[in-house]
Amino acid sequence: MEQKPSTLDPLSEPEDTRWLDGKRKRKSSQCLVKSSMSGYIPSYLDKDEQCVVCGDKATGYHYRCITCEGCKGFFRRTIQKNLHPTYSCKYDGCCVIDKITRNQCQLCRFKKCISVGMAMDLVLDDSKRVAKRKLIEENRERRRKEEMIKSLQHRPSPSAEEWELIHVVTEAHRSTNAQGSHWKQKRKFLPEDIGQSPMASMPDGDKVDLEAFSEFTKIITPAITRVVDFAKKLPMFSELPCEDQIILLKGCCMEIMSLRAAVRYDPESETLTLSGEMAVKREQLKNGGLGVVSDAIFDLGKSLSAFNLDDTEVALLQAVLLMSSDRTGLICVDKIEKCQETYLLAFEHYINYRKHNIPHFWPKLLMKVTDLRMIGACHASRFLHMKVECPTELFPPLFLEVFEDQEV
């Protein structure tokens, strides 16, 4: 005999009962969600303050009265669309308005809105509402600018000690930067026929124009010498052991030379001026041995042209690149790191003093340090290919001394 399922077993509930129960649960959960999403209540309202129109929970001061969102919206729509002349009441305007009955009689609800003091003249039409919103946005933007100016005013400028350091670094750069501010007048353009006829094939598919490569090697030795002279003029660098000085110089040399070329990018002729004297186009530098490194330096030059860097900012960038404590084989890592931090802090304070108009200027400028480090790493890899493909006699001794045995 088949046993009937027990009515106490929850699994044996009739299907329609389970469906109704599920519906009730969904409705209950929806109510919980709705209640948890209730709007912001201003601090000037007492706890559980009621709407003066219907008695529901008030959300703020609307049209001169404390009301709920529902009555606020009803009153606004009525005035904006001029609906009140169309309202009527089945009970001679004697309805009691509360949160249950408020939607049953529009006329009595509107009359109560007026009787409790809601002001019709405070309801804006579409054009006034747009104008008000625009005014709010303008005020917001004005406050934002005022706060930004205030924050800029409170950013520290360099201290007396930092100004002294900044002066030393700037002079070190100026005295070792070929042609100085007169580079445009003194530069000579590399003839266009040089660097356009690649001869030696490189392993990565690029080719080297040996004539262009030969031209570049003529200016590389004095360019390297000037970077070394710049470093020696910095007191913090001179205090380091010779072994660390050599590692730091080998690590930063290409980065600093690239920076010095990049800040001499000319958008009109689309050239970089190398070592303050030789203006070259992108393809010439690329075919002359640098390959994709050429693209990176030109791209850096184009982006830096918007920064309008002065000599001091270029000098401090070089000092930060020089004092990189993550170079392999260093002895005085902590000391070098502290030196770089000193330069960075003076640099940041100088940026505050300069008051550039570019938003977030300081972090954007620091990103260029990363770009220059990447250029240095790419050149180290490229140098290995050049050594294989180009005749050894074309490499100046100082060029080999600096770039050989670099970590790739």
From Swiss-Prot:
ZnF (NR C4-type) ranges: 51-71, 89-113
Keywords: DNA-binding, Metal-binding, Nucleus, Phosphoprotein, Proto-oncogene, Receptor, Transcription, Transcription regulation, Zinc, Zinc-finger
Span list, region Modulating: 1-50
GO molecular function: nuclear receptor activity; protein domain specific binding; RNA polymerase II cis-regulatory region sequence-specific DNA binding; sequence-specific double-stranded DNA binding; TBP-class protein binding; thyroid hormone binding; zinc ion binding
Job of this protein: Nuclear hormone receptor that can act as a repressor or activator of transcription. High affinity receptor for thyroid hormones, including triiodothyronine and thyroxine.
Family: Belongs to the nuclear hormone receptor family. NR1 subfamily.
Name of the molecule in the record: Thyroid hormone receptor alpha
Species this protein is from: Gallus gallus
Lineage: Eukaryota, Metazoa, Chordata, Craniata, Vertebrata
